[in-house]
Amino acid sequence: MSTIQYDMLYLLSCGVNKTKPQQNILEQYKSDDRKLMQLYWFSKQHFVDALTGTGLKQAGVTLPDPWEKDMAKAVRKVILFDAERARILSFMEQRGIWYLPLKGIILKEFYPSVGMRQMSDNDILFDEAFAEQVREYMVSLGYEVISFGKGNHDVYEKEPVYNFELHRALYGAAHDNNWEQYYRDVKERLIREEGSSYGYHMKPEDFYIYIMCHGYKHYQGGGTGIRTLLDFYVYLESLHSEMDFAYIEKECETLGLSEFEKRNRALCRKVFGDNAFAELPAEERVPDTAAHTTKEIITKALSQEELDMLQYYMTSGVYGTFDRRIENNVKKYSKNGGSSKIRYVIKRIFPGMETYQYYPFFYKHKWLLPVCWLYRLLRVVFQRERRERILREADAVRKVKV
């Protein structure tokens, strides 16, 4: 990790803790446009450029135009999503459809100001018995149906920015079976929103467990970026005193998340905590020397295992990477011995039944699965895009060290 990336972590800590960055850190970016653009690029890669940009701007740093525009777009996007979501939830209220806003819809409220917590979509769990009615309504609003009846959520998109993932279930057959069973009857654990007939929310502990579970899903898949760790910190910092950690630890143990939760709880506080950078040198220290202080402080505070975990977050980008997803999937097959690469290839050619949910006809008529295998093969042969993706996947598998 570069010193600029460590500075980014420091600025994120300042942003969520509402503290002004030290002047000797700011001077580096006021006087060096190249470093400022690198900081922007790293922040944008992790979808936290609105947060770092706001802190810099409030401290007197002049931002490049693209950064200013991204910050304005982040605020506008939240405002547009909030209004559109209110309309959709009003429809659900009128039709007697229970619903549960998820993920960023909730988390953004724990950040200091509008637009600081950026997101590309809105996720809502709803009563799947009304999926057809909801689809008709979304189409009437001008949405394109990107996906319907495949997996555990339906996807709707509309210009200029709208992307709604409407979940029939929190987890489905393609996910960990333990998670799918745990969340199958999630409505029984929900709390009705005050002033609403059909809107619900999770109690703080359950929401924390859910975002930890969601974070782990991405972490062990293609990876997930530093925003995930920041979300953990912001939520913990806001509600820590109210939460029952004995309950959290018990439920995380049930879900197989115990070690992941404990490591992240410690790591996020060490990286973003209010006192994480208390050892930064005094303002009179010269800028050239101060350039390395954020890196020194973090590397000193973390164990090697924690540094490795932080590095994993920092090299994953906001939604993970293709190569990392392939690597993690291949390594899953090494646990039981044998050639993990061969087992991975066989699984890709002859996938489990969860995959066939994306082929409704074959999922319904399972005796025709051999035809589906041939269909999948022919698509690779005759569709250039799929062929290129398979070649890229094969190259990624080849590079995996097991």
Predicted segment positions?
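Conserved NTP-donor binding/palm subdomain of two-metal-ion nucleotidyltransferases/polymerases, i.e.
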Residues: 1-120, 126-402
